[in-house]
Amino acid sequence: MAEFRVRVSTGEAFGAGTWDKVSVSIVGTRGESPPLPLDNLGKEFTAGAEEDFQVTLPEDVGRVLLLRVHKAPPVLPLLGPLAPDAWFCRWFQLTPPRGGHLLFPCYQWLEGAGTLVLQEGTAKVSWADHHPVLQQQRQEELQARQEMYQWKAYNPGWPHCLDEKTVEDLELNIKYSTAKNANFYLQAGSAFAEMKIKGLLDRKGLWRSLNEMKRIFNFRRTPAAEHAFEHWQEDAFFASQFLNGLNPVLIRRCHYLPKNFPVTDAMVASVLGPGTSLQAELEKGSLFLVDHGILSGIQTNVINGKPQFSAAPMTLLYQSPGCGPLLPLAIQLSQTPGPNSPIFLPTDDKWDWLLAKTWVRNAEFSFHEALTHLLHSHLLPEVFTLATLRQLPHCHPLFKLLIPHTRYTLHINTLARELLIVPGQVVDRSTGIGIEGFSELIQRNMKQLNYSLLCLPEDIRTRGVEDIPGYYYRDDGMQIWGAVERFVSEIIGIYYPSDESVQDDRELQAWVREIFSKGFLNQESSGIPSSLETREALVQYVTMVIFTCSAKHAAVSAGQFDSCAWMPNLPPSMQLPPPTSKGLATCEGFIATLPPVNATCDVILALWLLSKEPGDQRPLGTYPDEHFTEEAPRRSIATFQSRLAQISRGIQERNQGLVLPYTYLDPPLIENSVSI
C-alpha cells in the first residue's frame, strides 16, 4: 500500500467549479491503480479552490508516469445520475510517499463524464519520452484531438479552417469565457441600439453634407479618431497613415517608376522644389510607392440595389529632406495609364485631389480588411492554432509555448464566419467589394504570399523602409519581434540541443507540414517551410507564429475604428466610378461618391466592435496558465516580461512627444492571441 497526497486547483472563472465526482488513477512503471475518489466532507472543487486529498494505492505502481482523471455526475437515490457539470481544472499535484512533488498542469475544461489523461509537467519533445506508456499516451492524445478538431475548406483558394458552423458547436476549451461572451454581446447590443435609435441603420440614401456626417462621428469617438477628423484632408496625414495607420505593410521604397505610372518632372516640381528631379530623388531613395494593383478588376458589390465601384490606384510619395513629412506626389487610380486615367497631383483643384486621395483610402479599406486583417491576421493564426492542437501533445514544449497565443482564436473566427463573411451580414451588406470581392482578393493574395512577408525583419528589408523616419509600426514592431525572438531562442535552446534534435522531432515536423498543407495549400513558391532542419530555422518560424498571433494582429486590428470613425477618411465603398478626367469634382459629387448612410453606420459599428477587446484580456507575455513547470523556462518567461516592460516604457516616453501617439504596439495593449 502507498499513501499519496493529491492537491487539486480549480479555476476562478465563472462556472469553473463542479458538483461532479472526481477520482484519479495513478499510472506508474509497475502498473495502474484503480480509480481513487477525491472526496472530503462537504462540497469539493469550488471555483478558485485548492484542496488536499489523501488516497491509498493498494499496490506500489512504481515511478509515476501519468494521472488519469475521471469525472462523473453524482447519482441520486431513485433519480439516478444528474446531468454532467463542467469543471475547469488548473492542475494536480501528487506527493508520493517518499516525498517530493509531481505537478500535472491541466488548464482545461472537463465537460461531460469521462476521463482525461495528464502527464507530469516536465516538457518533452517526441524523442525524449522513452517509456512506451508515455509514447502511447502522446499518440492517443493526438488521435483524440484530431478527431475533435477537424479541417474544412471554407472557400476555394483560402486557408483551411475549423470544421464547425457556429460558436454554439464549439467545446468549452476553445470558447469565449462566460464573462468575455457576455461583454461582447452587451457592447454589441448597446452600440446597435444607439445607431438604431438615431435611425441611421435604416437610411439608405446619401449623406446630405459633410456636416451631417458629424452626427455619426459622436459615436464612441477616440482621440485618434478626432485627430483623423481634424486632419483627414491634409496631405501629410494622408501619407502618414501608410506608416502608422491600420495598414502599415504596403509602402515600399521606389527605385524606379513603374512603366504604367508615367509621372513626369513637370508634374511634381512644385512639391520637390528647385534643384532636383524625379531621377535624382529615385537615386537618393526618397521616393516611395503604394501599389493597390491587386484590386485591379476585382468583383464589386451591390448596396441598396445600387452597383458599387472599386479602383486599383498607385500612389507616389516623397520623403521631405531633414526628417520632414512624408507627402503624396501623384496618384493614378488605375493600373492602365492613358487619357481616361489621369495622374492626380497636389496642385490640382481641391476636390479633384481630395477625391483621388479618398479613392486611395477606399482601396486601403478593401486591401486591409480582406488581406492584412482577415487573411494574414485571422485565417493564418487559425491555421497555426488548429495545427498546434492537432499535432502537438500537451507535454510538448512547443505546445506549452504556443497555446497561450491561440486563446479564443477559433471562437472569434467561427463567429466571423457566422456574422461577418456570410451572405446577408456586414461584409455582404455594406462593403464595396462584398463577399465575392473579399474571396477573390484572398485567392489572388494566397498565390503571392511568401515567407518573408510574414517575418517582420525580412519584410522591412524587402520593402526598403529601414530608415524612413516616423515609422512607428516598424520601430515598435522590430523591438517586439526581437524580444519574442530572444524568448523563443531561449526556450528552443532548453529542449533542442542540436539541429539533429529538431530534425528528429516527428511531432514538430508534422506540425510544420500541416501548416504548410492546410494553411499555405502546399505552395512551394511561397517559401513557407514544409519541414525545419535547424534550430535557427525553428526559432524564426515560432517567432513568426507568435508575432503574427499577437503584435501583428494588434497593429492592424486595434486602429480600425480610429481610422473609420470619420468615414471619409476610410470609406468602405464608393457609389460612383473613379474619375476619368480632371476639373469636374465638386463637394456634392464627392458626397455622392461616398457610401450611403446605412452602410456607413453598419461598418463603423462592426469595426468599433472589432477594435475593442470585450474584457478577459491577457496582454503579450502574460501567462497565468503555468504550462511550464521547470525553472529554466520560467526564468525565460520572467526575462521576456521584463524586456516587454522596458519596451513599453520607451514607447510611452516617445509618445509623450507626439501629436498623435502610436499605441497599437505598446505591449500592455497587445493581446497574446487573436481573440477579437
Swiss-Prot record:
Leader peptide range in chain numbering: none
Keyword Oxidoreductase applies: yes
Effect of residue 44 to A: Abolishes calcium-dependent association with membranes
Tissue: Expressed in hair, prostate, lung, ovary, lymph node, spinal cord and cornea.
Keywords: Calcium, Cell junction, Cell membrane, Cytoplasm, Cytoskeleton, Dioxygenase, Iron, Lipid metabolism, Lipid-binding, Membrane, Metal-binding, Nucleus, Oxidoreductase
Annotated compartments: Cytoplasm, Cytosol; Cell membrane; Cytoplasm, Cytoskeleton; Membrane
Pathway: Lipid metabolism; hydroperoxy eicosatetraenoic acid biosynthesis
SMART domains assigned: LH2 (SM00308)
Effect of residue 676 to V: Does not affect arachidonate 15-lipoxygenase activity; destabilizes the enzyme structure
A Pfam family recorded for this sequence: PLAT
Record protein name field: Polyunsaturated fatty acid lipoxygenase ALOX15B
Originating species: Homo sapiens (Human)
